[in-house]
């Protein structure tokens, strides 16, 4: 009996489980691993003191990108583009590779010259005047190394000279001459490209330390200033700006460091600059602007970064130059303007770069551009309603009277017609 009851209970349990599986099959849902930025952003909704959090820059003030590439498995790709790899190295590593390449090639061919002399037996007939060696006066590895340097650098033979009785030496001489020319072209080319890089030219392109938000021509604008310290100008200069801000889509996807274009005059051509003196770059905050709904009180709470990029060709070399900088929320001043730096002197304009980064406070509403537009619309609406509403009300009353009293309207029309006939008579 006990075994029968146990068997019956087990079957009931199995049948119940199978029915449950038929009704509702459990599915193991694996939550995707959030990016590190998203995991860091999760407790921010609970934290009240968000303004004190340090915002991690995407681009530093000096223009260097604050991004490190990790877990790169396909490192062979760096060797396929060996020229760019060498140019991107620091100067100390570049000079070390430069010296090592020449030293290794000299030692390699010096070893081969010594082996040829050793195999031919030239070392055993150094003092024999009747013996014709492959290379005269080559009596050891040091002399072979010096002969290799003389051959590859083409400084001219002196005490050691190759003879015509050594065909293997002649072939080796041709190989070393060709490979030496290739090494010279490659290494000198790398050094020339590294020296002529326009990165240092970007050091003389300066951006203001702060960006400002104030009114300009009755519109709320975001502004920053750029300048060129050199007398040789940047040709075909253009500027653009990006807003770096993490976002979450309506489907729940988290996009870290989402990039949004900031219009600084692309459609009007104001983004193309004649950068002879410092210029103030302006972005009008309108409905297409990402700052449309941001007010003065909300700005410190936002976690965003504005990346500005200035590009152009160096007048002296014709190479493309790019300068970058960025502004975080703590570097955006609401209600300020830049101090003028350009003054007219006797026959020329003078730029005072001591005041390049200075700002002064000005009267600016603390509302967002959206709120200002709504207030402006509310101020204009009663003027239009006062005329149109009265006309509509008058028309509606007339139509209602006509619908209610159609007979009276016909009698009035008849009376008017009789009066006209009597007046004619």
Swiss-Prot record:
One of its GO terms (biological process) is regulation of monoatomic ion transmembrane transport. The chain crosses the membrane at residues 92-116, 169-190. Residues 392-425 are annotated as: Disordered. GO terms for cellular component: monoatomic ion channel complex; plasma membrane. The keyword Ion transport applies. It is a multi-pass membrane protein. Residues 1-91, 191-425 are cytoplasmic. Signal peptide: none annotated. The modification Phosphoserine is found at residues 18, 25. Its main location: membrane. It is found in: Membrane. The record marks 184 as: Role in the control of polyamine-mediated channel gating and in the blocking by intracellular magnesium. Pfam families: IRK (PF01007), IRK_C (PF17655). It catalyses: K(+)(in) = K(+)(out). The keyword Phosphoprotein applies. This is G protein-activated inward rectifier potassium channel 2. GO terms for molecular function: G-protein activated inward rectifier potassium channel activity; inward rectifier potassium channel activity. Expressed in insulin-secreting cells and brain. A motif (PDZ-binding) lies at residues 422-425.
């Amino acid at each position: 009996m006990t075994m029968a009851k146990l068997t019956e209970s087990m079957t009931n349990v199995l049948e119940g489980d199978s029915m449950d599986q038929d009704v509702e099959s459990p599915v193991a849902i694996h939550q995707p691993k959030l990016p590190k930025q998203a995991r860091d952003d999760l407790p921010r909704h609970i934290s009240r003191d968000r303004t004190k959090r340090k915002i991690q820059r995407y681009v530093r003030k000096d223009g260097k990108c604050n991004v490190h590439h990790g877990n790169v498995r396909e490192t062979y790709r760096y060797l396929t583009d060996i020229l760019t790899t060498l140019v991107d190295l620091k100067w100390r590593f570049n000079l070390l590779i430069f010296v090592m390449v020449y030293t290794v090639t000299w030692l390699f061919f010096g070893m081969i010259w010594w082996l040829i002399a050793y195999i031919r037996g030239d070392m055993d007939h150094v003092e024999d005047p009747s013996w014709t060696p492959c290379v005269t006066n080559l009596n050891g590895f040091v002399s072979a190394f010096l002969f290799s340097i003389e051959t590859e650098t083409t400084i001219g033979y002196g005490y050691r000279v190759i003879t015509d009785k050594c065909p293997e030496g002649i072939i080796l001489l041709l190989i070393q001459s060709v490979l030496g020319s290739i090494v010279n072209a490659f290494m000198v080319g790398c050094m020339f490209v590294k020296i002529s890089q326009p990165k240092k030219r970007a050091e003389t392109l300066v951006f203001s330390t702060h960006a400002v938000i104030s009114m300009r021509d009755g519109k709320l604008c975001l502004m920053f200033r750029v300048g060129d310290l050199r007398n040789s100008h940047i040709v075909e200069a253009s500027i653009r700006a990006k807003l770096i801000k993490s976002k979450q889509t309506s489907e729940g996807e988290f996009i870290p460091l989402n990039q949004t274009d900031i219009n600084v005059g692309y459609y009007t051509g104001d983004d193309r600059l004649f950068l002879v003196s410092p210029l103030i770059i302006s972005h009008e905050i309108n409905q297409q602007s990402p700052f449309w709904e941001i007010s003065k009180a909300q700005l410190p709470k936002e976690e965003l970064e504005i990346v500005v990029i200035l590009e152009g060709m160096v007048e002296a070399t014709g190479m493309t130059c790019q300068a970058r900088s960025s502004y975080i929320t703590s570097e955006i001043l609401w209600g300020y303007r830049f101090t003028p730096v350009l003054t007219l002197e006797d026959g020329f304009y003078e730029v005072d770069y001591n005041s390049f980064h200075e700002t002064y406070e000005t009267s600016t509403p603390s509302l967002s551009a959206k709120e200002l537009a709504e207030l402006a619309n509310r101020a204009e609406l009663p003027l239009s309603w006062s005329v149109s509403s009265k006309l509509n009300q008058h028309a509606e009353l007339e139509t209602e009277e006509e619908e209610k009293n159609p007979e009276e309207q016909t009698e009035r029309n008849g009376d008017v017609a009789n009066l006209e006939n009597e007046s004619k008579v």
